UniProtKB/Swiss-Prot annotation:
One of its GO terms (biological process) is positive regulation of metabolic process. This is Integration host factor subunit alpha. The lineage of its organism: Bacteria, Pseudomonadati, Pseudomonadota, Gammaproteobacteria, Oceanospirillales. One of its GO terms (cellular component) is cytosol. This protein is one of the two subunits of integration host factor, a specific DNA-binding protein that functions in genetic recombination as well as in transcriptional and translational control. Pfam families: Bac_DNA_binding. Keywords: DNA recombination, DNA-binding, Transcription, Transcription regulation, Translation regulation. Coiled coil: none annotated. InterPro entries: Hist_DNA-bd, Histone-like_DNA-bd_CS, IHF-like_DNA-bd_dom_sf, IHF_alpha. The gene is ihfA. Belongs to the bacterial histone-like protein family. Heterodimer of an alpha and a beta chain. One of its GO terms (molecular function) is DNA binding. NCBIfam families: himA, PRK00285.1.
Length: 100
């Protein structure tokens, strides 16, 4: 089985909720757009029962060019982090090893 895509999510909304395909696709896009806008505005996203998306600042640190071995600085940047919620962790652990 491959990765779950936005198209797969829209198809599921179409099948399970009876939305038409255009509405289902728009709903999925709007969901992710809301998450993007919140993070762009430095607002954490907390999805109860699923997990939290937060922003974290990473400071500059030394790095190395793997081809030449030359030391180069890795610039400071802001990154998105995801922390799974307890319910998600429990569901994943319950199914660990039962599917391949």
């Amino acid at each position: 089985m491959g990765a779950l895509t936005k198209a797969d999510m829209a198809e599921r909304l179409f099948e399970e909720l009876g939305l038409n395909k255009r509405e289902a696709k728009e709903m999925v896009e709007m969901f992710f757009e809301e998450i993007r806008h919140s993070l762009e505005d430095n607002i954490p996203v907390k999805l109860s029962g699923f997990g939290n998306f937060d922003l974290r600042d990473k400071s500059e640190r030394p790095g190395r060019n793997p081809k030449t071995g030359e030391e180069i600085p890795i610039t400071a940047r802001r990154v998105v982090t995801f922390r799974p919620g307890q319910k998600l962790k429990q569901r994943v652990e319950a199914y660990a090893g039962t599917k391949s």
